[in-house]
Amino acid sequence: MEKTFDKIVSHAKNTGFVFQGSEIYGGLSNTWDFGPYGVLLKDHIKDAWQKKFIQEDSNNVEIQAAILMNPKVWEASGHLKGFSDPLMDCRQCKTRHRADQLIETATNGEVNPEGWTNEEMENFIRDHHIACPDCGGHDFTPIRQFNLMFKTFQGTLEDGKSTIYLRPETAQGMFVDFKNVQRAYRKKIPFGIGQIGKSFRNEITPGNFIFRTREFEQMEMEFFCKPGTDLDWFTYWRQFCMDWITNLGGNPENLRFRDHEKEELSYTLEKNGEVIANNNVAKE
């Protein structure tokens, strides 16, 4: 599997699908430029998504919300306090690690610490003698939360009043514009609002190649429905998404849907799941 993946990466780089970002200046880790073929491929996927999710369903509309939003949006959504990763430093080699990923890696994925408290993760790492993957040491600092949003400043002053964030997801723009869309298009629920756009997350442990990058593009739709019908609609859209992926060429034998356990759900969710393809996870 690893050799096959390496061949795919090599082919993508050599044929103009993807280039290393800032390559002639030494590159910048976790950044990638899409070449001519890469752009065409992305555009075809986005066109297919727009056609299936927006154009073929009269209940759904598309918007383009701003990347920069009033910080009160992120305060109201809980991102300022809750959108964070649990980090530990190795005191021996000074490397930084996500506590949850240390546990998942050490247990070969058999233990999922999502929803655990910092204390529970610290105790598990200590009791199971989980070592630093870089030096093999067992001396970690206490866990602290690191916010994943990129912070910058609006205007000429760099102070608290000028603080602004690059959006970590596209969803909030659709929530904020819900009333505007409903009024302008005289929509009645159920209906969906979709958009395609860039999002940014200051990932501590980015993934391999173009997976889990700090700058990425999302195709997302928020579907608004009457209370009490949400689980029915969830079931409908879950199958809809799976059908869309297989129609794009995904092999059904290599795909499965995993419902998240209750302890994995964030405070905003009643139900959630993900499509899993050969251990590569694509969030629904």
What are these model-derived regions, one by one?
Residues 2-284:
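TRNA-recognition modules of translation machinery and tRNA-sensing kinases, especially anticodon-binding
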